[in-house]
């Protein structure tokens, strides 16, 4: 009986050690490719239609894709970003925001608009 408990305990300790090592490896792993190396954009039309793009090699390419995806001749870029972008809306207006995280981009857009809600977002 004592041998069985000892083996179970050794196994549990070994599993815990492997789990800790795996968690440390995941925690310390380098971040994926720099978000600053790619661009995204969000474009809006006066009728509320929008287009988004992300993971483009240049700002111009990201903006052109967002405008094209929007699909209307009056589409204009509201925000361009390297990490995350969001667009806040209310009954009267739309406002773009950017940030290093989605939460930061949403907060930026809502702050610039003075309230409202998040209509769309994208991150690289």
UniProtKB/Swiss-Prot annotation:
GO cellular component: extracellular region; peptidoglycan-based cell wall
Pfam family, one: DUF4189
PTM section of the record: Predicted to be exported by the Tat system. The position of the signal peptide cleavage has not been experimentally proven.
Keywords assigned: Signal
Signal sequence extent: 1-35
Alphabetical list of InterPro entries matching this protein: DUF4189, TAT_signal
Keyword Signal set for record: yes
Family under the similarity heading: To M.tuberculosis Rv1813c.
Official protein name in the record: Protein Rv1269c
Organism: Mycobacterium tuberculosis (strain ATCC 25618 / H37Rv)
Phylogenetic placement of the source organism: Bacteria, Bacillati, Actinomycetota, Actinomycetes, Mycobacteriales
